[in-house]
């Protein structure tokens, strides 16, 4: 199949067609884009792991054993080791590798923490074939000899980012530091990238809602399908709207946690290097890697070899460098941006770009292949936005006049870009980890593990405090369940559930939560609040099991610290607020994704298996640990006559054929009533996240196991294991202690 360089049209169309209403959790998938793609899923049946390194491989240990100095020297040497099959522009691969690293990290989004550089996803579809990643397959091939040499000691994920750092350093640019430890995965991650049927051009903006001020669909960050950030030609490809371009830039960069200053610094810093490629008509652009012929060995976007050697290459379609010194760090970008007036032109590929009016020869750039030739510099509509938007312009003028300020801002913003999805600083490895703690790393002061006697006394006091099992379990869940396995943010460590904004989230039942936290603070003595919240939840679960005639022990790894407002960027935590939390039967409002699919999404972010998710839902319902419903208080989904006891009643009653379920008409298919099949009397109220465990064949199979006589202990053990997993999900201070 052929794909157009500008529009992203794939010949033959796409077999997946949404109806414009409710979408699936994952939207358009690789199979939709490439129906003939080799399917390996059958080999993963039975839980077979595709990781060839095996479960016992410790990547962090391997990384820390690398000859780091030698690796960086090899990367430095590569920068100017131009290869005939893909020659370096200006004799230097630095700009090419910066783009590779930028695009590896730049898929990160704050909405769900997915994307980013932490697992080397740029190697796989769809990212390896996005139009915005055009020709980066060659960058990865250039790196292969170094990856092969250092083997298990450097992951692709780490190599992408470190190579970007070395590229900047090799051209005189500023670098703040580097933290390694990104472990490769060996298959595409299941991420929602959008529902559009084509990439980049008109028709690829269904995520934008013009009637709502061009609001961008959550959790997406890129403005169009197949882009990392924005369309460089302008909003929807319209170059006549630089102000609208600024709006798009502000939105998309904010969704990857960047403010205006960081946005300007990153844009200017990235565009200080290299050039855009649009030397040929767009219709000569070859097929993307994932759809190419077998004998091309995973390479795509190919053209005539002689034209490649001559630099006649098309990627974005825009053609030309931004500065007269494309392989040297400096301030030429801002100098030229403000020195000249720019006129709208088109590249040989037909892309819109901006060219300086009457440029001086000294401000011309060398040709990428023949330094004796001079070519004009260019700006994109995105660059023009920095000049047109008042706030961006103010920052840009300051950077133009203060090189040191630009150096520092770019170095810090680049570091943030490349490390935002790595989680707490304790996960960073290697000799170049900066000592400075940064607020976006969500720092937590070190805690002290309490004595066994202090723990025992506290748990007894909690159970005598008058707080209910439900209240204690809900508080612990509210604290820990913010964790995201995607970017390793959130979790119980730090007890940020007592700080803004988390303390006021509707899902947390703020009034009840405040009462619980106040009492725990009164009782905790020398314990941190973070430990106290989790210990109180464990005490409640143990009591609930005893009250049901069982005995369980809920292990708690103590030693958590307490964060303060000073340690917390409250605004950055707002995307962690749950829109839906099926474990608590919470739904803010009906969404375009089915409620039960949002439960699956939440379980995925928590790193849970299907049995763990199932047991947690059933256990939380039995404990009465659900968010308060407008009409039914804390009873919706609580399918038991003995709430507060840890039983398998939820599954038993859900699967009872003596109950007939009906939709509550005014609920919009979100709420259901369970009636006695004979008498017609109401027995239960439930939601989609309850009934899915009876309606979905795979989830029903799980529920049946937990409902069976003789499997009560299996249910309890699975619930406790899953609960502990969630409570300890963010304890990198413990799991990484051996490396630091």
Curated annotation (Swiss-Prot):
Report the source organism: Erythrobacter litoralis (strain HTCC2594)
Family recorded in the similarity comment: Belongs to the peroxidase family. Peroxidase/catalase subfamily.
**What GO molecular functions are on record for this protein?**
catalase activity; heme binding; metal ion binding
Specify the protein name: Catalase-peroxidase
Taxonomy, top ranks, is: Bacteria, Pseudomonadati, Pseudomonadota, Alphaproteobacteria, Sphingomonadales
PROSITE patterns this protein is in?
Answer: PEROXIDASE_2, PEROXIDASE_4
NCBIfam families, alphabetized: cat_per_HPI (TIGR00198), PRK15061.1 (NF011635)
Instruction: Quote the PTM field.
Output: Formation of the three residue Trp-Tyr-Met cross-link is important for the catalase, but not the peroxidase activity of the enzyme.
Keyword field contains Iron:
yes
């Amino acid at each position: 199949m052929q794909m157009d360089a500008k529009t992203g049209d794939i010949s033959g169309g796409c077999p997946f067609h949404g109806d414009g209403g409710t979408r699936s959790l994952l939207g358009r998938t690789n199979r939709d884009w490439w129906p003939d793609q080799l399917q390996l899923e059958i080999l993963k049946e039975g839980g077979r792991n595709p990781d060839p390194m095996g479960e016992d491989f410790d990547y962090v240990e391997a990384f820390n054993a690398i000859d780091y100095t030698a690796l960086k020297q090899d990367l430095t040497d590569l920068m100017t080791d131009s290869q005939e099959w893909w020659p370096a522009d200006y004799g230097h691969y630095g700009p090419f590798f910066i783009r590779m690293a930028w695009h590896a990290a730049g898929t990160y989004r704050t909405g769900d923490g997915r994307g980013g550089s932490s697992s080397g996803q740029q190697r796989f579809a769809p990212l390896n074939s996005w139009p915005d990643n055009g020709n980066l397959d060659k960058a990865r091939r250039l790196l292969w000899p170094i990856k092969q040499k250092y083997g298990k000691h450097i992951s692709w994920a780490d190599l992408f980012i470190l190579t970007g750092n070395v590229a900047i350093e090799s051209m005189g640019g500023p670098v703040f530091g580097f933290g390694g430890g990104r472990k490769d995965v060996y298959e595409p991650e299941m991420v929602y990238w959008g529902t559009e049927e084509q990439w980049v051009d008109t028709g690829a903006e269904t995520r934008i809602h013009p009637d709502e001020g061009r609001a961008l669909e959550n959790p997406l960050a890129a403005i169009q399908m197949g882009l990392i950030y924005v369309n460089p030609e302008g909003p929807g490809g319209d170059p006549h709207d630089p102000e609208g371009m600024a709006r798009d830039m502000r939105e998309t960069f904010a969704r990857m946690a960047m403010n205006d200053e960081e946005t300007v610094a990153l844009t200017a810093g990235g565009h200080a290097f290299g050039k855009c490629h649009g030397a040929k008509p767009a219709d000569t652009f070859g097929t993307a890697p994932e759809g190419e012929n077998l004998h091309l060995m995973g390479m795509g976007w190919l053209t005539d070899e002689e034209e490649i050697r001559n630099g006649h290459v098309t990627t974005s379609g825009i053609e030309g460098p931004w500065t007269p010194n494309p392989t040297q760090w400096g301030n030429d970008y801002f100098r030229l941006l403000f020195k000249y007036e720019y006129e709208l032109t088109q590249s040989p590929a037909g892309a819109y770009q901006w060219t300086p009016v009457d440029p001086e020869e000294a401000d011309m750039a060398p040709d990428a292949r023949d330094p004796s030739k001079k070519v004009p510099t260019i700006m994109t509509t995105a660059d023009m936005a920095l000049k047109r938007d008042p706030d961006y312009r103010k920052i840009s003028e300051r950077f133009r006049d203060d090189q040191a300020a630009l150096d520092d801002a770019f170095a810090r913003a680049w570091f943030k870009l490349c490390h935002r999805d790595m989680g707490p600083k304790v996960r960073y490895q290697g000799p170049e980890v900066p000592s400075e703690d940064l607020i976006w790393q969500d720092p937590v002061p070190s805690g002290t593990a309490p004595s066994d006697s202090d723990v025992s006394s506290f748990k007894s006091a909690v159970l005598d405090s008058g707080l209910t099992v439900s209240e204690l379990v809900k508080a612990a869940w509210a604290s820990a369940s913010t964790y995201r396995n995607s970017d390793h943010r959130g979790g119980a460590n730090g007890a940020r559930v007592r700080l803004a904004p988390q303390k006021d989230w509707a899902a947390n039942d703020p009034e009840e939560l405040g009462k619980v936290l106040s009492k725990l603070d009164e009782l905790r003595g020398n314990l941190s609040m973070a430990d106290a919240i989790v210990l109180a939840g464990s005490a409640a679960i143990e009591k609930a099991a005893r009250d049901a005639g069982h005995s369980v022990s809920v292990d708690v790894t103590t030693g958590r610290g307490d964060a303060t407002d000073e340690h917390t960027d409250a605004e950055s935590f707002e995307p962690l607020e749950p829109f839906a939390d099926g474990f608590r039967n919470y739904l803010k409002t009906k969404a375009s994704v089915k409620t039960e699919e949002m439960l699956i999404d939440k379980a995925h972010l928590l790193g849970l298996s299907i049995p763990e998710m199932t047991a947690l839902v059933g256990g939380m319902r039995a404990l009465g640990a659900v968010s308060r419903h407008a009409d039914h208080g804390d009873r919706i989904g609580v399918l038991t006559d003995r709430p507060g006891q840890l039983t398998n009643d939820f599954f038993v009653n859900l699967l009872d054929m003596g109950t007939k379920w009906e939709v509550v008409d005014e609920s919009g298919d979100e709420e259901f009533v369970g009636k006695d099949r004979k008498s017609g009397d109401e027995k239960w109220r439930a939601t989609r996240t309850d009934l899915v465990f009876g309606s979905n064949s795979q989830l029903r199979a799980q529920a049946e196991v937990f409902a069976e006589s003789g499997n009560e202990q299996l249910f309890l053990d699975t619930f406790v294991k899953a609960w502990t997993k969630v409570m300890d999900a963010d304890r990198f201070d413990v799991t990484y202690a051996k490396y630091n």
